[in-house]
Amino acid sequence: MPRGQKSKLRAREKRQRTRGQTQDLKVGQPTAAEKEESPSSSSSVLRDTASSSLAFGIPQEPQREPPTTSAAAAMSCTGSDKGDESQDEENASSSQASTSTERSLKDSLTRKTKMLVQFLLYKYKMKEPTTKAEMLKIISKKYKEHFPEIFRKVSQRTELVFGLALKEVNPTTHSYILVSMLGPNDGNQSSAWTLPRNGLLMPLLSVIFLNGNCAREEEIWEFLNMLGIYDGKRHLIFGEPRKLITQDLVQEKYLEYQQVPNSDPPRYQFLWGPRAHAETSKMKVLEFLAKVNDTTPNNFPLLYEEALRDEEERAGARPRVAARRGTTAMTSAYSRATSSSSSQPM
């Protein structure tokens, strides 16, 4: 191969490698400026991405911004390959257009998913089944070919966020109802309408975990607002939301609601309650988050390490608890034996 062509080939390969590394750095690592501005920037990105996915109840991938033509040219380290750069610019432009179209469709499907979820929640509140034909009317015929994908995402959101499973009750008419996954269900329709009082609990515990095991009240409301749940506005499923999170779940010891120390004016925060610690774990919550994000727990490395430490501490605590129980039982038995012997006549 002539030397000039070899030089062009090497330059092109170098540009491609540089672009790939730059894009990886954009996605996986904060810049030096970002680190200086916020030492926990990577944790913040992780928290925001997971919270958004949790709120929408459907898997969402971090959106990668393709490198701009000017940035790619600046990193190319060549000044003579004008033809190659022109071709690269055309490819980049085509790639950006394709990405924009895909993102637009994804946003539209997300909106249709949220509309259908709200419709199904209304039907649930009214104790009415719905049909596939009605659901198609909600999303409009334009998105008919995407109905299977929308239906899957709707099912996932109602299941994960609201504790309601979408079940087909009549295959002939394609009729569906939302069934509580938390209440008793013996198969008849009346018990299927049981209100899932704690359906919001796992998402709330997840938000607290994502915020360093202690979430400010405004962070909780920000998350609830993304779900269409607002302070002072009665919700179709959960009723009065403030009462639910600051009284009901607190009285049931799933949540703790306390004033932030030294806050003036007073501000409040949420933590896991003792019952939440007893009935679930950070690993279970992380598995829930992973399911929402359609991934595995170890893809959240910082949270995964914390969850593993929590599992180890729990495993170490179990033998100590068992030992204490054994000691208590032995002491109690000894006391009973002593009491019995002392009561015998000499």
UniProtKB/Swiss-Prot annotation:
The keyword Cytoplasm applies. GO terms for cellular component: cytoplasm; nucleus. Disulfide bonds: none annotated. Residues 1-18 have a biased composition (Basic residues). Its main location: cytoplasm. Pfam families: MAGE (PF01454), MAGE_N (PF12440). SMART domains: MAGE, MAGE_N. It is found in: Cytoplasm. GO terms for biological process: negative regulation of transcription by RNA polymerase II. Keywords: Cytoplasm, Tumor antigen. Residues 1-107, 311-346 are annotated as: Disordered. Residues 92-101, 318-346 have a biased composition (Low complexity). Residues 45-54 have a biased composition (Polar residues). Expressed in testis. It comes from the Eukaryota. Residues 109-307 form the MAGE domain. This is Melanoma-associated antigen B4. The gene is MAGEB4.
